[in-house]
Amino acid sequence: MAIIKPFKGIRPPQNLVEQVASRPYDVLNSEEARAEAEGNEKSLYHIIKLEIDFPVGMDEHDERVYAKAAENFQLFQDKGWLVQDNKENYYIYAQTMNGKTQYGLVVGAYVPDYMNGIIKKHELTRRDKEEDRMKHVRVNNANIEPVFFAYPDNEKLDVIIKKYTANKPVYDFIAPGDGFGHTFWIVDQDADIATITAEFAKMPALYIADGHHRSAAAALVGAEKAKQNPNHRGDEEYNYFMAVCFPANQLTIIDYNRVVKDLNGLTPEQFLAALDKNFIVEEKGADIYKPSGLHNFSLYLGGKWYSLTAKAGTYNDNDPIGVLDVTISSHLILDEVLGIKDLRSDKRIDFVGGIRGLGELKKRVDSGEMKVALALYPVSMKQLMDIADTGNIMPPKTTWFEPKLRSGLVIHKLD
């Protein structure tokens, strides 16, 4: 069973939400954050991308940066840019992209559920990134940014969400830059709060869609606080961390593509000939070619697009990891032909989220920056959940979710 609870969210007043809300800390660099926050002292970047308040070149992991985050978080509250609700609520957060809306419940997720595997992971985390987020949680004593969860479809929750979203929202705005819609309601009726809690308690698992490092950091800090408290009871606020939970049937995973700097000493002809061992290779010409389904790949090289279809026998349908296109391409193209052994550390490879389109792959190859691009058919939510359920881990850079959660709509304090 998944344990969740409502919480007293800290939120911007309605008239300030568009100034406060920001993109997540990990989808933009310091230079981009400086540009987006320019002239806006209320931007959440002054809490989550603190290096922008220091001279250019300041190490974002400097202790002074973390201290400034806590100082600014308090300042935002003192100035009334962030105000705590006086009652424990759940919240509904809807995102609209390209005319499609997905509705998430904002809840306090239970730290022990993360530790004992009820909250399921599909990615490995890096300790240095965990520690960075842990410092941020510690100094602020809060989850400033939420994690993105998926839950099994649930009709009773659908009914409650429909009831609230028929009413006027607390926030409703279009984010600058991406044009995505962000809408927000408060679930404040006790009977509905009780039903939501009870329905989650029936769920065997929740699934991290995006935010593995934030989840790990929040859970580890919660466990730290429990250990440090001689009177720990288990119901303290630090036992919970903020998550936005979406029904799995509303989520779409976007392709996550690869670009590589060189052909590992091969000529284009030798490279294509090497691919012929495991793939049916078809030239598609100058027009962009998109993968048509599982085990079909799109390759861009020398101004031409190619279709690659994995030959029978090159993968195992009964292996939940081996059957993934990201695994097939990693083993049979990136490793076997291009000599790229470690996707995490090899400097010859870069990754491009599908939201940028296949034109971005063409652009990076045509510019001479990269030599070849590889586009993959996206994994499904079912594949993700099956892999998490079996305790397996997806290869690096497998999933890309869009739209990203907007930060700053609500914050969860740990006391």
Where are these regions (language model features)?
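Surface-exposed, charge/polar-rich loops and edge strands
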Residues: 1-415
